[in-house]
Amino acid sequence: MASSTEQILEIIRQLAAERDTFTSDDIRPLLTGDLTPRSIPSAVGKARRDGIIEEIDRVKSSIPERKGSLVGVFRRPGSTLATASSNSDLAQHPSAVVSSTAQEIIELRAYLERMGYLCGVEELASVLLMLSSRTWLILSGPSGTGKSSLIRHIASAVGGTLHDVQVKPNWISSEDSLGYFSETSQRFVPGVLSSALIESAKDTSERFHFVRLDEMNLAAPEYYLAEVLSAAETWRRGTAGRMESDPIQLPPMPEKVEAPYVALSDNVFLVGTVNVDETTRSLSSKVLDRASVYDLHHVDLFGLPAKNDDLQISPPAAPGLVKLLKDRPHSVSELDLPDGLVLEVGELLSQLNTYAQTLGGPIAYRQRDALLTLASLAEKHQITDILSRSAVIDIGIRACILPKWQGSTLAAVTALRGAIATILELDTQPAEISTEVARSEIPRAKYPRTAEKLASMLEQATNLGYFSAW
């Protein structure tokens, strides 16, 4: 007999197939037999992780005994996986309707859950796309959400090597990360970051190297990573046939001292984790311009990983994901751009650019190219079976553009309202946009993730007098 969670999951599939949006309150009247509302949260969490539904907002409950509490607003994502998952028969055999790469992501998510790590197919697909599309990936979110664990599991799943760099609060220059000249030994002493890069350069195999900077904003990255950020601007074909960046400028040392050659290469993935609290620093525009910032904000306190008695479980084979991670374009000229993508992205960013200058700086080629790369890779590797094109663009805007947006002036709040009207495609004046209006339109939005974040920022501005994407 199916468990209560599985039975409620069938109800959620039915609602996702029949309605544009629904809340957990809509599930309650459909419960029969021994099913109780206590099982709804765990079933909803599993449905979201499986890609059956996506949470697009939170509203106050309409049930008298729960009056005032917030409940999620859900809808079926516009992806092949979501459509199939709404069908009970197809849900048992997703490989019949999705690409092999999408199936590998589904299997990898199941493997992570057996290893004790909960995440959704959307989160996993998004992180893998961002690893391939940009030099830097920054994972943000509350402490304890598994930011560091996610990269460790991904590295293990694709046969990669993880280099763990623990950032210290007293790091004030590149000598702390890249190394320094020792007056005592009269030689250059590599730092933890340069050591990892040197080791990855010596690896002639096709193994991936993941360099994880844990809590990277305990110190100011623009101080201890300035040379790395600058070197990553230019790429060329190295002597070993591998794409590599310009040489990273090391701290000063006497001319007679032999310094190691340090550069980034295509087999290296730079990942930083950040917490936002009173002990950390805000990230500068120089860092945010060059990174994708993915927020692991979904915390399912009702979800538990399945029991696993096999302690020697191996990760599933993932040739499609390995191919994705090897495909790292460094220029839009290397992309096979899908039809209509440049027009869609260009028109949207042009409209947002009207307000971006006031919110954190204009949207430039770097941000546009990041969105084009994300969407192109998603379609080339058929990850659009999990994330539709509009979902990829939505995730890209939230990850590559919004992190710089902040303000406290009347002009900034007005610009924020204008950006919300643009994202929601509302033909109204910015002054007429309120948090309530924005949230009421999110269920119909083409880019709900961006709209939800902007609505939260407007609510913050209303309550506190300032707003920030963080």
Spell out what each predicted region is.
Residues 34-46:
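Short amphipathic alpha-helical interaction segments
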Residues 1-14:
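Short alpha-helical segments that sit at the start of domains
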Residues 20-30:
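Short acidic, hydrophobic short linear motifs in intrinsically disordered regions
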Residues 86-323:
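AAA+ P-loop NTPase catalytic core and its hallmark functional loops
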Residues 59-82:
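Short, cationic-aromatic polyanion-contact patches
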Residues 102, 310-470:
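Alpha-helical lid/collar subdomain of P-loop NTPases
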Residues 49-58:
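A short, conserved structural fragment
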